[in-house]
């Protein structure tokens, strides 16, 4: 039986090698849709700390999130010179918010654990406890392809160390960073 399989394999290889058809170009050999997960597109595979969301006299920043539970920044710089500062959260992934939803919540660093714990039971309010005084500002929970914005007074950030995080259960350990007041 082994000899029979070996003979058939050799015949198939021989016929394929002697084919009159030219070899397919390398680009066609592995379509992008069939690439393994480890070869994810650069936008989703970029390290979360690769960029800062700069203030630079600008009173707005954009933070992107993806299906890999990553923000594209670990530091949001807020200018003291701004009367209001707007942060837009864009979910660049495709997963729905029920399974891979993201929000952006700002609170003092020492309050963030409590914000997470209280948010777990608040699915109806985007995993943020209603009227939580520890929360400076937050976006709504969004799914792939959606965006949401928050606006805050930079003066609220003057008295301590602040963090931002996603409060969707289980996401905060990976999806967090600092909010830095600059200028």
From Swiss-Prot:
Covalent lipid sites (S-diacylglycerol cysteine): 18
Keyword Glycoprotein among record annotations: no
Subcellular location as annotated: Cell outer membrane
Membrane topology value: Lipid-anchor
Annotated lipid attachment (N-palmitoyl cysteine): 18
Gene Ontology CC entries for this record: cell outer membrane
CDD domains referenced in this protein's UniProt entry, alphabetically: Azurin
Record InterPro entries: Azurin (IPR014068), BlueCu_1 (IPR000923), BlueCu_1_BS (IPR028871), Cu-binding_ET (IPR050845), Cupredoxin (IPR008972)
Region (Disordered): 27-51
Protein name according to UniProt: Outer membrane protein H.8
Lineage, top ranks: Bacteria, Pseudomonadati, Pseudomonadota, Betaproteobacteria, Neisseriales
């Amino acid at each position: 039986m082994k000899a029979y399989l070996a003979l058939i394999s050799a015949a198939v290889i021989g016929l394929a090698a002697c084919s009159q058809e030219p070899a397919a170009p390398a680009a066609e050999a592995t379509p992008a849709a069939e690439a393994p997960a480890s070869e994810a597109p650069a936008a989703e595979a970029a390290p979360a700390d690769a960029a800062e969301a700069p203030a630079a006299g600008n009173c707005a920043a954009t933070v992107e999130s993806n299906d890999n539970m990553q923000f594209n920044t670990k530091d949001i710089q807020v200018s003291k010179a701004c009367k209001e500062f707007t942060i837009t959260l864009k979910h660049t992934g495709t997963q729905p918010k029920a399974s891979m939803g993201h929000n952006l919540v700002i609170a003092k660093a020492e309050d963030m654990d409590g914000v997470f714990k209280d948010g777990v039971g608040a699915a109806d309010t985007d995993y943020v406890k209603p009227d939580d005084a520890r929360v400076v500002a937050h976006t709504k929970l969004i799914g792939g392809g959606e965006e949401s914005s928050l606006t805050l007074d930079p003066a609220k950030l003057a008295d301590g160390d602040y963090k931002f995080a996603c409060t969707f259960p289980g996401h905060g350990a990976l999806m967090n960073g600092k909010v830095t007041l600059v200028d």
